A protein has these predicted regions:
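N-terminal secretory signal peptides that target proteins for export/translocation
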Residues: 1-28
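ATP-dependent carboxylate-amine ligase
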Residues: 4, 34-36
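Bacterial N-terminal signal peptides
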Residues: 37-46
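Sec-dependent signal peptide cleavage junction
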Residues: 47-59
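Short, non-transmembrane alpha-helical segments in secretory-pathway proteins
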Residues: 65-121, 159-188, 240-306
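Exposed beta-strand-loop-beta-strand "reactive/processing" segments of non-cytosolic proteins
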Residues: 105-148, 190-215
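A short, surface-exposed interaction/processing loop segment used at functional sites
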Residues: 142-180, 214-259, 337-365
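Hydrophilic extracytoplasmic domains
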Residues: 277-365
């Protein structure tokens, strides 16, 4: 397996320009950013934790006097090569083992020769986004979270060309909301941070304004209350999911997924039907065996945080070889991302008890 390890320190993005690389002012800002990064990396040679500390900083607000031409999407080669060492070895091993297991089965077989790129997720680097590319083309992603015991868990993974936290949709949303000037710049002192709350979320803080939350997939504005509704509880994060640990080893079964990708908004008759009961991951799996397409609707005001309502079209089972009955298996359910070719896989326990399940009407059942 060929891995090109990139470590992106742009978990926190600051007020500045979204101009393209051909703009001379943007190029000058990239040069300044590269020099700054070089200084950070030089410091890391003296103290290896310097880069890791910089990446784990959850919120560094750009001063009002900062250069307004600062690029939000600096992707210089010096960043790629110099700071990859900040990715913990334990995370690398867990990710590589996970990708190896997935690549043994369709539709993940292209991942066998994939390149992996790592980006920390805030606050406090409690998560990592790992993007998967093959010959420069996006193939999928993994989101890995830190557990309370210091290990790692597989919080989510996905297959397809639409990746979380893509800058393009975010740029369009900020412009549509009138938050950027004609040159694509945010007000000085602005802060953009990647968050994971059960779904990818951009947290946008602007001077003298309420914090905005924007979907990390489709750039839809989310209600503020949704962030708390979907926030992961780290105390129970390792239950019923693929987890790293010296006593753990996991084997992925071939996923069972229907070809049909129903959209809950195309046929709302499911709203008039009775909800189904799933009190555990195994019960949810049995529902999917009986009804190939279900719809999940979150309870309360948590729909936006989960990205719900959404369809469930299958599952993938992971078997533990740790010998522990409590960790015998983990079930991840398949969720087609609307209007894309991407399918998300979420741990079944994340949904059980957090909403209701309905049978999707139509040909799939």
């Amino acid at each position: 397996m060929i891995h090109l390890l990139h470590w992106h320190k742009n978990n926190v993005l600051h007020g500045g320009s979204f101009n393209n690389e051909n703009d001379s002012r943007s190029n000058r800002s990239r040069a300044r950013s590269a020099l700054l990064l070089a200084a950070i990396c030089t410091a890391a040679l003296i103290h290896p934790l310097a880069v890791a500390a910089a990446g784990s900083e959850a919120a560094i607000i750009t001063p009002a006097s900062a250069d307004p031409s600062l690029s939000l999407a600096d992707d210089s080669s010096i960043r790629k090569s110099a700071v990859s060492a900040a990715v913990p070895q334990s995370l690398l091993h867990f990710t590589e083992d996970t990708v190896e297991q997935l690549s043994a089965h369709v539709p993940f077989t292209a991942w066998s020769e994939a390149e992996l790129e790592y980006t920390p997720l805030g606050p406090g680097t409690h998560g990592w986004l790992v993007t998967v590319t093959d010959e420069g083309l996006p193939q999928g992603y993994l989101i890995i979270s830190a557990s309370e015991d210091g290990g790692y868990v597989l919080s989510e993974y996905g297959i397809g060309g639409t990746l979380p936290f893509s800058l393009g949709p975010l740029e369009q949303r900020l412009a549509a909301e009138g938050l950027t000037d004609p040159e694509g710049s945010l007000p000085q002192g602005s802060l953009i941070r990647k968050r994971y709350t059960g779904a990818p979320v951009w947290e946008v803080t602007l001077p003298n304004q309420d914090t905005l939350y924007i979907s990390g997939f489709n750039s839809e504005l989310l209600p503020n209350v949704s962030l708390a509704s979907g926030t992961l509880d780290r105390s129970g994060i390792s239950k019923g999911v693929v987890a790293a640990g010296s006593a753990h080893g996991w084997s992925a079964d071939a996923p069972s997924i229907t070809e049909h990708r129903p959209d809950p908004y195309d046929n709302l008759q499911w709203l008039t039907s009775s909800s189904l009961t799933a009190r555990s991951s195994s019960e949810l799996r049995r529902l999917l065996q009986k009804h190939p397409s279900l719809v999940f609707k979150s309870k309360g005001d948590g729909n936006a945080a989960f990205g719900a309502p959404f369809s469930l079209t299958g599952w993938q089972r992971w078997s533990s070889v740790s010998g522990s009955a409590a960790d015998a298996a983990a079930i991840y359910v398949a969720i087609p991302l609307r209007n894309t070719d991407t399918t998300r896989f979420l741990p079944a326990p994340r949904l059980v008890g957090q909403g209701k399940f309905y049978v999707y009407p139509g040909k799939s059942n």
